[in-house]
Amino acid sequence: MTDGRDDGEFAMVGEVRTGLLMNRLALPSDQVAELLDLVAGERVRARERPVPWAVSADQLHGVDCPLITRSGARPRAIGTLAARVRVVGGRVVQGSTRSVVAPGGDRRQRWSHYMARPGVVELGGRGDPADAAARFLTGRAPESLDPGAVSEALLRRIRASPLLDRRSPFRPRRTRLRWSAVVGGERLRGAFTLVDAELRTVRLRVPEAAGVTREQLTALCEDLALHDWLLTTVARVVERRASDADPAAQDDLLAVVGQLLHLWLPSADVPPGLGGMWEGIEVNPGFTRQWELCVNRLRDELTLRALRGGTVPQ
């Protein structure tokens, strides 16, 4: 999927599913690269600082299904979804699937036409991309476009890898982040919504003058999904285990400290044109404020347990 800028207004939709890599310890970088070698002849992108991550090459998935619009129309969406897997810190895994939504036409094209536009679905008839992107976050018709199903299939493939021992120190719930973005208009607007214990939605409107790419929009939503999952997971472990007298409870708390806390670095990769989205989230719902409260409670609990045991952690 090209990283280039699109001329004029364009819309994107996607879904990121985030969870813990099923392994006792963080996977070393060389094994992460092997795990993510999903497309023959394509390289795995990786970096080590400030937080190590690696991402697989894109896989394309052909689709031909309805995409319900806000007006109630059901134009067919024909084209390809681009899907990839991202591993952060050798510990957190994300299945990420997305597509540009573009106007098509009244006539169906040969598949060679759609394959020449990787990561783009075209709406038939008079389907409006921005209208379809707005409806995507709330429309749940079973036969409609479902990037999350592709993300889930990728995660199942990763879980089956012999590189993983499936001996995770704890088993947190996975989260789903569905997102839509429209590039056009004059100012940045964004909304992050907690729908339920598993599902979140992000709605973005980005000014064309920001000059953002598809890759930057995708990376922003993956970063939001990562930090939402970290906050959700740490908060749940602390809430469930802080007052638990079971010796295994301390193991869970220590596992969180040793394997997850250092991955918190919000907005580290966000381009200037999208920085306002993270600034808004820091106000409401206040990710970092909530994170600091959770971490302080976690460390206080470990200190109390150490005092009861006669030792204080250094």
Can you describe what each PLM-predicted range is?
Residues P28, S56, D128, D146, ...:
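Serine/threonine-rich low-complexity intrinsically disordered regions
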Residues V55-A83, V206-A209, T232, V295-P313:
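Generic hydrophobic segment detector
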Residues A181-A245:
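Extended, charged amphipathic alpha-helical segments
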Residues D223-A225, W229-Q314:
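Membrane-associated alpha-helical segments
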